[in-house]
From Swiss-Prot:
GO biological process: arginyl-tRNA aminoacylation
InterPro entries: aa-tRNA-synth_I_CS, Arg-tRNA-ligase, Arg-tRNA-synth_N, Arg-tRNA-synth_N_sf, ArgRS_core, DALR_anticod-bd, Rossmann-like_a/b/a_fold, tRNAsynth_Ia_anticodon-bd
Entry protein name: Arginine--tRNA ligase
Record localization: Cytoplasm
Enzyme Commission code: 6.1.1.19
One Pfam family from the record: DALR_1
Motif 'HIGH' region: where in chain: 132-142
Protein family according to the UniProt entry: Belongs to the class-I aminoacyl-tRNA synthetase family.
Catalytic activity: tRNA(Arg) + L-arginine + ATP = L-arginyl-tRNA(Arg) + AMP + diphosphate
GO function terms (MF aspect): arginine-tRNA ligase activity; ATP binding
The gene coding this protein: argS
Subunit structure comment from the entry: Monomer.
Organism of this sequence: Cupriavidus pinatubonensis (strain JMP 134 / LMG 1197) (Cupriavidus necator (strain JMP 134))
Length: 595
């Protein structure tokens, strides 16, 4: 149902239950769900069973009394055609054809806004994701973060939040020093495996590319920074470090552009040190009595906030542990006015959650407990030609996002080849690969491990989930082209006043009714997915919607001689196409007109 329909019907049920309950009774919210069998109706409600004990009533008898009161409520009369009691006290409802038709009309009138809420009505939210170290190309784990984070940001935007996308660069610490030493070794002619190759060095081919460009004195720049020109001097380790970090940030920018992800802000870890924020956070915790010294180190009393043991903040060598700059960074999020913050990270960050939250609570600056929220994802395994792929020649030790996009795109075209050739619209050349990677990485819950099958991503049949969904959209477009010619979109307005009885009334096929019901679920599905921080639910929904469409297409011929039936079925398809477009837009996947 439409949100307003659900609200009115829930209000009718709630008022009925309240009239039967003691004045001081605590009542659960009334909810509706789709019955497992279509024969049981359009909706089911279990409120009678939920409150029977509190009302000291038999659930079935209570359900009968609720039904009688709801049937007399004018808010329900225009929505509900009939109600039946099943089993121990379920209330099954059949909706009126008018209520079903209102859904289709809402989709057609609201168009690209169907399912969306007014921007800003829920305040602002910061979503941090990807946040890779600038020490190498983005790997498939970063790709899963990018797909999850961007889809979640889109989802929250659809639900009325002002969304701020942020990338936190870990550009300080020992890994950056290892990067600089690795590039320096290549500038001196050493390679992985040589006796003089540094023990902690990075081995990918990209290190050699950076070294060659550094020796050539080239200039590189990242999307949010000043250009950096290489000194060309192999002994100038500071110049090598700055050049290498900026070079890799630019490479990551290219990967994100290919993936269709844009950030509002890039925050540098190094700035937390130069601005004195890390030291300020530490001194703030010391001043609040949340720390103590032991064995030459400074410890944070994280057990005060539920951690299993206290944690070292400052090691004996004077350096800070990993979570300390994270505490400082999150104080900036709070100070910038982001009262809701969501971090999308790998499951290997699980251990830092309690530490960061304990640090924020210890500062006692008004940050609520449980801040920030986290969405943690598990690892991705890549399969190609029936075998697991563990190593990329470019990266040296892992499969990159760029590899995955290029492999899933089909053909021999590469992103680097397009860039070197000066192809201005190069990202559009990789739409197929981008769509496949984004959809696939959202096709499982974040907390489950995922196997990315490149061979499956290349298939053009129903086995491929993104093809299955996109083909539903393309097939609808083909039907409309047969109906209205090349300019069919301009004729869709003709369907606005269509009599929809053929797809919502007594003579409508089960497939048409099921498709219409699925369209009605879209707004509430988005709201639930946003509330649960679960963008995978959108991908799940789109697969179900595509399945309902294909079932309808196989059951009901659309372009029939009966004009009233034809127009009603075209209106149903126009609504289906719109919801497919909207759902795909939420997860950042294209809706092609032809395939």
């Amino acid at each position: 149902m439409l949100p307003v329909q659900t609200s009115n019907l829930a209000a009718a049920f709630t008022d009925a239950v309240r009239a039967l309950a003691p004045a001081d009774a605590a009542l659960p919210a009334v909810t509706f769900e789709r019955p497992k069998a279509a024969a049981h109706g359009d909706l089911a409600c279990n409120i009678a069973m939920q409150v029977a004990r509190a009302l000291k009533s038999n659930p079935r008898e209570l359900a009968q009394r609720i039904v009688a009161m709801v049937q007399a409520d004018p808010r329900a009369a225009e929505l509900v055609a009939g109600m039946e009691i099943a089993g121990p006290g379920f209330i099954n409802l059949r909706l009126t054809p008018a209520a079903k038709a209102d859904v289709l009309r809402a989709v057609l009138s609201e168009g690209d806004g169907y399912g969306a809420q007014e921007r800003g009505m829920h305040g602002n939210v910061l979503v941090e994701f990807v946040s890779a170290n600038p020490t190498g190309p983005l790997h498939v784990g970063h790709g899963r973060q990018a797909a999850l984070g961007d889809a979640l940001a889109n989802l929250l935007s659809w639900q009325g939040y002002d969304v701020h996308r942020e990338f936190y660069y870990n550009d300080a610490g020992v890994q950056i020093q290892n990067l600089a030493v690795s590039v320096q070794a290549r500038t001196r002619g050493f390679k992985p495996g040589d006796a003089n190759w540094p023990e902690a060095a990075y081995n990918g081919d990209y290190i050699g590319d950076i070294a060659a460009d550094f020796l050539a004195g080239k200039t590189v720049s990242a999307s949010d920074g000043e250009p950096v020109t290489a000194s060309g001097n192999p002994e100038d380790l500071d110049s090598i470090r700055k050049f290498a970090v900026t070079y890799l940030r630019n490479e990551q920018d290219i990967d994100l552009q290919a993936f269709g992800v844009k950030f509002d802000h890039y925050y540098l870890e190094s700035s937390l040190y130069t601005d004195g924020r890390v030291e300020a956070a530490v001194q703030g915790l010391v001043g609040k009595g949340k720390t103590y010294e032991s064995e030459g180190a400074l410890w944070l009393r994280t057990t005060d906030d539920g951690d299993d043991k206290d944690r070292v903040m400052k090691k004996t060598d004077g350096t800070y542990t990993y979570f300390v700059p994270d505490v400082a960074y999150h104080t900036t999020k709070w100070e910038r006015g982001f009262t809701k913050v969501i971090n999308v990270q790998g499951s290997d960050h699980h251990g830092t959650i309690a530490r960061v939250r304990a640090g924020l609570q210890g500062l006692d600056i008004g940050i609520p407990k449980g801040y920030p929220d986290y969405v943690l994802h598990k690892m991705v395994t890549v399969m190609k030609n029936g075998e697991e792929v563990k190593i990329s020649k470019r990266a040296g030790s892992y499969v990159t996002v760029r590899d995955l996009i290029e492999w899933s795109n089909g053909g021999d075209e590469t992103i680097r080849g397009c860039l070197d050739a000066g192809v201005a619209d190069w990202p559009e050349h990789f739409t197929r690969g981008r769509d496949a990677v984004r959809f696939f990485l959202l096709s499982r819950k974040a907390d489950t491990e995922f196997v990315f099958d490149v061979d499956l991503a290349l298939k053009q049949n129903d086995e491929n989930p993104v093809y299955y969904v996109q083909y539903a959209h393309a097939r609808i477009c083909s039907i409309f082209e047969s109906w209205g010619g090349a300019d069919w979109e301009s004729r869709l307005a003709e369907l606005a006043g269509t009599d929809l009885a053929a797809v919502t009334g007594a003579d409508a096929s089960p497939q048409a009714l099921a498709l219409g019901q699925r369209l009605a679920e879209f707004p509430e599905m988005l709201a639930a997915a946003a509330g649960e921080l679960a963008p995978h639910a959108v991908a799940f929904y789109l697969r179900d919607l595509a399945g309902d469409f294909h079932a309808f297409y196989n059951a009901d011929r659309v372009l029939v001689d009966d004009e009233a039936v034809k127009r009603a079925r075209l209106a149903l398809l126009a609504a289906t196409r719109q919801v497919l477009r909207n759902g795909l837009a939420v997860i950042g996947v294209s809706a092609p007109r032809r395939m």
